[in-house]
C-alpha cells in the first residue's frame, strides 16, 4: 500500500467519523476530540488532514454533493422524454430525502454556518456551482436531443429546479410527514414537467 493510499484511508476514516458525530450530535455539540476518538486517530493526526471542524463539515457535505451530482447525471442520461425527466427528478429527490437524511441535515448545518464562516461560505458557493453546472449541462443535452423545450433560459431553469427541490427538502426536514404525502411528489413532477416544456 502506498503512502498516498494510507493517507487517503485515514482521511476517509476521519470523514466517516465526522459524518456520524455531526449527524448524531449536531455541529455545535460535536467536538474534534469526539470525532478523532470515533475515527480511532489522535487529534494531532486529525488536524494534519483537516484544519478545523468547519472544514470537516464542508468536506462531509462535499462528499454527499458528489453523490448527488452522480444521481443527476444518471437521471439525465436515462431520460428519453420530458415526462421521464420530471419523474426521474422526483426519484432523485426522494432518494436523497429517504436514503440519506444525514446529508440533508448536514447540508442545512452547512448553509447556516456559511453566514459566519468564509471557509464554509466558499465551499457552499462552489458546491452549488457544481450542482447548477451539472443540471445546466443535462438540460442542454436534453434540449439538444429534442426531449425538452423550456420557455426560459437553461441557466435560470437549472437554478429554479434546484431551488424547488431544495425548498421541498427543507420543508421535509422540518415537517417529515410532508414527505409521506404523495401529493407533494405529484406536485413536484407536474411542476417540473411544466417548466421543462414539450419536446418534439
Model features per residue range: what roles?
Residues 1-9, 200:
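N-terminal intrinsically disordered/low-complexity leader segments
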Residues 10-18, 35, 60-64, 68, ...:
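Generic hydrophobic, amphipathic alpha-helix propensity
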Residues 119-125, 129, 143-195, 199-200:
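Hydrophobic/aromatic-rich alpha-helical bundle segments in the mid-to-C-terminal region
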Amino acid at each position: 500500500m502506498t503512502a498516498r493510499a494510507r493517507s487517503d484511508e485515514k482521511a476517509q476514516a476521519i470523514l466517516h467519523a465526522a459524518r456520524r458525530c455531526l449527524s448524531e450530535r449536531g455541529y455545535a455539540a460535536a467536538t474534534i476530540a469526539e470525532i478523532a476518538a470515533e475515527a480511532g486517530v489522535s487529534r494531532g493526526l486529525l488536524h494534519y488532514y483537516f484544519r478545523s471542524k468547519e472544514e470537516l463539515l464542508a468536506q462531509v457535505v462535499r462528499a454527499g454533493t458528489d453523490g448527488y451530482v452522480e444521481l443527476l447525471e444518471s437521471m439525465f442520461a436515462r431520460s428519453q422524454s420530458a415526462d421521464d425527466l420530471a419523474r426521474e427528478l422526483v426519484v432523485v429527490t426522494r432518494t436523497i430525502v429517504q436514503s440519506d437524511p444525514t446529508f440533508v441535515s448536514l447540508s442545512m448545518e452547512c448553509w447556516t454556518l456559511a453566514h459566519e464562516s468564509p471557509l464554509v461560505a466558499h465551499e457552499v458557493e462552489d458546491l452549488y456551482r457544481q450542482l447548477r453546472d451539472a443540471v445546466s449541462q443535462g438540460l442542454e443535452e436534453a434540449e439538444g436531443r429534442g426531449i425538452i423545450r423550456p420557455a426560459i433560459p437553461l441557466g435560470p431553469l437549472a437554478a429554479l429546479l434546484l431551488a424547488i427541490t431544495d425548498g421541498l427538502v427543507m420543508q421535509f426536514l422540518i415537517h417529515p410527514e410532508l414527505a409521506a404525502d404523495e401529493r407533494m411528489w405529484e406536485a413536484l413532477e407536474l411542476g417540473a414537467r411544466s417548466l421543462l416544456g414539450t419536446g418534439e
